[in-house]
Amino acid sequence: MIQSERKLHIEPSPDEGQFKLKIAFTTLDRQHVDQHFGTAKCVLIYGVNEHHWSLLEAIEYPVISDKTHDKLPARIADLSGCAAVYCNACGVSAIRQLLGDNINPVKVSEGVNIHLMLAEIQEELRGAPTGWLNRALKMAEKKKHDQSSDQNRLNKLMDEEW
């Protein structure tokens, strides 16, 4: 499995709990969506909610052959917790694997500005989210509810007499 070359985290780390979603963008120039998912040299991950967004992580990948398929598991693992990845193209195998990990691949035209895409996501969050965004919000809410249920069960277990 081909790992990422570098992962850069923002310090001090923004509180990821303040964001409704994490969204990834494939980019070479770090300003525009301009890469195919499978061959992207860089992925930027942002946290976003209705009122603001923040860069959380930048991931760089080594240059490898286009025919190497064992790169996908590491790339998808790097996107863990992301609701979507914006890219110019994405292969069928990658789409299947991304969807299996509840990450929506979103194809956009080459050169789309990342900050404009974040503003559009925020606008939709303030309104009535549809499509993948609506599904991602429901999934995030369910995950949060499941985690709080697990914590409640653990607290009850700890309160029991042994």
What kind of region is each of these model predictions?
Residues 1-76, 106, 112-162:
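Non-catalytic interface/targeting segments
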